[in-house]
C-alpha cells in the first residue's frame, strides 16, 4: 500500500471548519480546523476544496473542475450528506401538507457519491469517505426555527422531532454502504 503524503478534501462546512458563533450570531471559520491540525501533525499536504452549504451535486461539479485543472493527490477525503438530507424548512412551514423533498434525494445522493468515488479511483487516488456527524434533532429543530418559522407547522409535517434524526441516519447509512 502506497504511503499517503497529499490529500484533497471535498465536502461541506464540517470539513471546511465552519462553526456557528453563538456570541456573534453567525458562522465563521475556525482559526485552525481539525483537518489542518491533522495535516501538520502527520506531515501531509492538504488541499481543502470544501465549501459551506455544499451538497454532493455541487461537490461533484467542483471535483470535476479541479481534476480537469490538474488537481492531484494520493487520497481524496469525501464528506457529504448533511446538507443533502436537509429540507427547505421555510417551505415546510408555509405548507405543512405539501410534498417536500430534501435538497438531494437519497437515490441521487448515492449515485453521485459513487460517481465521485469512481472519479477518484480513476485518477489513481485512494477514496476516504467520512460518515455524517451525529445530529441532535431537538437542538437542530430549535436552531432552524429560531427565526420565527412555524414550529407547529413543521412538527405537523415531521410527525415528531426525532424524524430529523431518522432521516439524517438514512443518509449516513448510504455513506456506510
Regions from the PLM with identified roles:
Residues 1-50, 66-72, 76:
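Serine-esterase "nucleophile elbow" of acetyl-processing enzymes
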Residues 2, 64-177:
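Alpha-helical cap/lid subdomain in secreted, periplasmic
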Residues 50-52, 82:
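Short glycine-rich, polar/acidic loop-and-turn segments at beta strand-coil junctions
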Amino acid at each position: 500500500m502506497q504511503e499517503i503524503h497529499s490529500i484533497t478534501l471535498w465536502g461541506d462546512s464540517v470539513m471546511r471548519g465552519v462553526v456557528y458563533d453563538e456570541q456573534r450570531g453567525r458562522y465563521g471559520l475556525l482559526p485552525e480546523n481539525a483537518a489542518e491540525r491533522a495535516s501538520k501533525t502527520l506531515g501531509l499536504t492538504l488541499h481543502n476544496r470544501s465549501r459551506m452549504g455544499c451538497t454532493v451535486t455541487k461537490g461533484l461539479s467542483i471535483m470535476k473542475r479541479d481534476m480537469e485543472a490538474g488537481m492531484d493527490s494520493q487520497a481524496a477525503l469525501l464528506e457529504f450528506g448533511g446538507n443533502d438530507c436537509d429540507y427547505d424548512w421555510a417551505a415546510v412551514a408555509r405548507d405543512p401538507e405539501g410534498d417536500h423533498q430534501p435538497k438531494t434525494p437519497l437515490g441521487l445522493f448515492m449515485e453521485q457519491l459513487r460517481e465521485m468515488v469512481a472519479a477518484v479511483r480513476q485518477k489513481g487516488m485512494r477514496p476516504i469517505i467520512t460518515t455524517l456527524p451525529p445530529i441532535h434533532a431537538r437542538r437542530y429543530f430549535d436552531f432552524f426555527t429560531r427565526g420565527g418559522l412555524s414550529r407547529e407547522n413543521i412538527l405537523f409535517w415531521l410527525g415528531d422531532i426525532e424524524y430529523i434524526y431518522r432521516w439524517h441516519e438514512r443518509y449516513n447509512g448510504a455513506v456506510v454502504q
